C-alpha cells in the first residue's frame, strides 16, 4: 500500500506513475476526495467530543449546585447520538479509503522501462549458449513419460488438468533439486531455512498484496476461510507481520521450499502440456527484510543468488527487467530470469526477483528501530524464486537429453542424486 502522504504531497507525480501502470489517474483524485472527507469527519468528531466533555462538566456542576440539569442532560444525549452518526460515517469513509488504497499498485522505480506487455521487457544480461542438437530433441513432457519419470494421465484422472505424478527417478530428481537449492542458499548465500504453513489467512494474503485484487487466482478453503499459498513469499513475508524489529535483525534473509497453488485463471490455452504451468508446483523462495537504504543493493544480491543456481547447473539463461505493463502489483522493480527451453525454442521465466520497497511492509505493519529510542520505520521487503523447481526440472531434462533417450545429471546435482550420473535410456 502507498503512503497517503504521497497522494497529498505529490498527486501529479503519482498520477503519472499510475497511468504508466494502466490505471486511470482519476484514482488519485478519488483517494484525495475520500481522504479529505475522512479528515473533515475526524475534525468534526473531535469538536463534538470536546463539546460533550464541556456539557458533561456543566451537568456535574449543576448537580453539585443542586440545579435542574434536565435540559443539559438532553443536550448530552443528542450529542452522543450525533457523535455515533459521525463515527459511523467516518468508519464507512475510512473503509472505502482503505479499500481504494489497497487496489493501487506500487510506484515503480525510475529504472523500470515503459511498455504495455512482456514483449517490451528489456534484456540486461545473457549467460551461456543454447545447445545445438545433432539429433531430434524431445520435449520434456514426452521424454519424462517415456523414462517413467512422470504420469500426466493418471494425475488428470485423480485431480484434473494441470497436475502431475512424478514417479521413480522423476520424484528423485525433484527432491534432489529442492535439496540442492536449499543447501546452496543456506550454506553459501547466508539464508536461514524455514518450513512454512501452506495455508494462510486473509490478513496474510492482504499483507503481501494478493488480496483483495487477485482473489480469483487463489485456491480458498471456504469453511475455514484459509487460502492455499501461491508462493512461500506469503508466509515468509508475514513472519514479522505486526512486529517492530531491532536494527540487528536486519537484514533478515529466509529461504523455504513449499508447494505452490495457483488457479491460473487467466492462462487458458497457455502452456497446456508439461511442467511449465501447473496448479500445484514446488518452488524454493528467497525473502529479505532490509533497511530502506540497503534494499536496491539487496535486489542485485538476491538476483545473483538465483542466477548462481542456473550457472552451477550450466543452464543458459537471460535476465530481463520488467516493463511497466508487466510489473507485478506489489513490486517497484523486478528482474525475471528466463531459462532456455529447446521445446519452445525460447527463454521461459524461471524466477522473478523483486524489490517491494515499503509497499508490503505498510500493509503488514512490519517496522524496525535504528536504536531503542528511535521512531519505528517501515522495512523494505524483497523476494525471488530460487528457483521454480518444476521449470528447472524441465530445463534439465530438455538441455541434458542424449540421442539414446537418456538424461545426463548435471555435475552439481550428482551428490544429491545418490551419485547417479544418468537417467535412462528408456527400455521397450
Swiss-Prot record:
Disulfide bonds: none
Entry binding sites for ATP: 262-264, 349-352
SUPFAM superfamilies noted in UniProt: Class II aaRS and biotin synthetases (SSF55681), tRNA-binding arm (SSF46589)
GO biological process terms held by the UniProt record: selenocysteine biosynthetic process; seryl-tRNA aminoacylation
CDD domains attached to this UniProt entry: SerRS_core
Binding-site residues for L-serine, renumbered to this chain: 231-233, 285, 385
Cellular component, GO annotation: cytoplasm
EC annotation from Swiss-Prot or TrEMBL: 6.1.1.11
InterPro entries in the cross-refs: aa-tRNA-synt_IIb, aa-tRNA-synth_II, aa-tRNA-synth_II/BPL/LPL, Ser-tRNA-ligase_type_1, Ser-tRNA-synth_1_N, SerRS_1_N_sf, SerRS_core, tRNA-bd_arm
MF GO annotations: ATP binding; catalytic activity, acting on a protein; serine-tRNA ligase activity; transferase activity
Class of this enzyme: ligase
Function comment: Catalyzes the attachment of serine to tRNA(Ser). Is also able to aminoacylate tRNA(Sec) with serine, to form the misacylated tRNA L-seryl-tRNA(Sec), which will be further converted into selenocysteinyl-tRNA(Sec).
Stated family: Belongs to the class-II aminoacyl-tRNA synthetase family. Type-1 seryl-tRNA synthetase subfamily.
Name this polypeptide is given: Serine--tRNA ligase
Native source organism of the sequence: Staphylococcus carnosus (strain TM300)
Amino acid at each position: 500500500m502507498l503512503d497517503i502522504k504521497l497522494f497529498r504531497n505529490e498527486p501529479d507525480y503519482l498520477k503519472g506513475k499510475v497511468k504508466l501502470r494502466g490505471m486511470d489517474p482519476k484514482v488519485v483524485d478519488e483517494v484525495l476526495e475520500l481522504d479529505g472527507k475522512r479528515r473533515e469527519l475526524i475534525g468534526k468528531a473531535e469538536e463534538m467530543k470536546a463539546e460533550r466533555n464541556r456539557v458533561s462538566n456543566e451537568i456535574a456542576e449543576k448537580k453539585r449546585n443542586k440545579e435542574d440539569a434536565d435540559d443539559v442532560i438532553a443536550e448530552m444525549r443528542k450529542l452522543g447520538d450525533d457523535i455515533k452518526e459521525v463515527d459511523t460515517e467516518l468508519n464507512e469513509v475510512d473503509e472505502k479509503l482503505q479499500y481504494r488504497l489497497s487496489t493501487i499498485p506500487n510506484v515503480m522505480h525510475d529504472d523500470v522501462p515503459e511498455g504495455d506487455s512482456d514483449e517490451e521487457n528489456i534484456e540486461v544480461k545473457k549467460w551461456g549458449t543454447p545447445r545445438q542438437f545433432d539429433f531430434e530433441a524431445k520435449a520434456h513432457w514426452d521424454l519424462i513419460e517415456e523414462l517413467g519419470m512422470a504420469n500426466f494421465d493418471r494425475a488428470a484422472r485423480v485431480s484434473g488438468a494441470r497436475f502431475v505424478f512424478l514417479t521413480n527417478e522423476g520424484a528423485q530428481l525433484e527432491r534432489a533439486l529442492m535439496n540442492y537449492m536449499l543447501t546452496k542458499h543456506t550454506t553459501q548465500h547466508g539464508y536461514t531455512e524455514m518450513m512454512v504453513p501452506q495455508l494462510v489467512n486473509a490478513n496474510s494474503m492482504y499483507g503481501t498484496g494478493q488480496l483483495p485484487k487477485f482473489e480469483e487466482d487463489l485456491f480458498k478453503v471456504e469453511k475455514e476461510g484459509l487460502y492455499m499459498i501461491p508462493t512461500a513469499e506469503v508466509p515468509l513475508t508475514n513472519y514479522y507481520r505486526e512486529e517492530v524489529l531491532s536494527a540487528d535483525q536486519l537484514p533478515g534473509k529466509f529461504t523455504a521450499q513449499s508447494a505452490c497453488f495457483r488457479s491460473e485463471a487467466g492462462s487458458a490455452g497457455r502452456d497446456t502440456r508439461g511442467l511449465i504451468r501447473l496448479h500445484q508446483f514446488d518452488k524454493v523462495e528467497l525473502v529479505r527484510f532490509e533497511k530502506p537504504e540497503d534494499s536496491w543493493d539487496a535486489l542485485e544480491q538476491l538476483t545473483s543468488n538465483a542466477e548462481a543456481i542456473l550457472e552451477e547447473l550450466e543452464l543458459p539463461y537471460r535476465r530481463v527487467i520488467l516493463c511497466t505493463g508487466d510489473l507485478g502489483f506489489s513490486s517497484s522493480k523486478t528482474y525475471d530470469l528466463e531459462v532456455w527451453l529447446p521445446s519452445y525454442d525460447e527463454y521461459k521465466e524461471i524466477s522473478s526477483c523483486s524489490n517491494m520497497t515499503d509497499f508490503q511492509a505498510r500493509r503488514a505493519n512490519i517496522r524496525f528501530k535504528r536504536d531503542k529510542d528511535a521512531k519505528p520505520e517501515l522495512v523494505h521487503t524483497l523476494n525471488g524464486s530460487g528457483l521454480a523447481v518444476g521449470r528447472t526440472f524441465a530445463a534439465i531434462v530438455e538441455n541434458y537429453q542424449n540421442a539414446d533417450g537418456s538424461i545426463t545429471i548435471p555435475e552439481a546435482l550428482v551428490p544429491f542424486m545418490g551419485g547417479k550420473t544418468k537417467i535412462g535410456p528408456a527400455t521397450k
